[in-house]
Amino acid sequence: MKLKGKGIGKVVVEGEVIVSRKPLSFLGGVDPETGTITDPESDIKGESITGKILVFPKGKGSTVGSYILYALSKNGKGPKAIIVEEAEPIVTAGAIISGIPLITNVDISKLKTGMRVRINPQEGEVEILAEGNL
């Protein structure tokens, strides 16, 4: 199955998905040294986003969140890619300065943690390759 959205980036990426059904703040919500979700309100608290394709509905919080995303990337703890239903400026800027491929305007209800997907930002496509841990 392929989902269509809008993409930022040029690199086709394949990997395991980690899905949050709640908005995410990178400032105070993710540890930039470990890549672990620290937000006590998050449905994926304690999980690592390192090397995974991070899926969430939208960002929230401070503009500093863009720099936390950059720090995650510089520390080798960032996500491999981001899929977000609604990409607001914080997440968009963070993905751009970090070189993290991003797909937005996608119905994330079709995605579940553990799925394997391929994203093609130039085409704005998310292709589900394997169902994973349902």
UniProtKB/Swiss-Prot annotation:
GO BP term, example: isopentenyl diphosphate biosynthetic process, mevalonate pathway
The pathway noted for it is:
Isoprenoid biosynthesis; isopentenyl diphosphate biosynthesis via mevalonate pathway
Q: Which GO terms describe its molecular function?
A: hydro-lyase activity
Q: What is its EC number?
A: 4.2.1.182
**CDD domains per the UniProt record, alphabetical:** AcnX_swivel (cd01356)
Annotated active site: S62 (proton acceptor)
State the source organism's domain of life.
Archaea
Q: Which UniProt keyword terms apply here? A: Isoprene biosynthesis, Lyase
- Which Pfam families does its entry note? AcnX_swivel_put
Recorded catalytic reaction(s): these are: (R)-5-phosphomevalonate = (2E)-3-methyl-5-phosphooxypent-2-enoate + H2O
Does the entry annotate any disulfide bonds, and if so which pairs?
none
Task: Quote the HAMAP family the UniProt record gives.
Answer: PMDh_S (MF_00078)
| Known role | Component of a hydro-lyase that catalyzes the dehydration of mevalonate 5-phosphate (MVA5P) to form trans-anhydromevalonate 5-phosphate (tAHMP). Involved in the archaeal mevalonate (MVA) pathway, which provides fundamental precursors for isoprenoid biosynthesis, such as isopentenyl diphosphate (IPP) and dimethylallyl diphosphate (DMAPP).
Q: Which PANTHER family match?
A: DUF521 DOMAIN PROTEIN (AFU_ORTHOLOGUE AFUA_6G00490)
Q: Which family does it belong to?
A: Belongs to the AcnX type II small subunit family.
Subunit structure comment from the entry: Heterodimer composed of a large subunit (PMDh-L) and a small subunit (PMDh-S).
NCBIfam families found in the cross-reference section: PRK03955.1
Which protein is depicted?
Phosphomevalonate dehydratase small subunit
Species of origin = Pyrococcus horikoshii (strain ATCC 700860 / DSM 12428 / JCM 9974 / NBRC 100139 / OT-3)
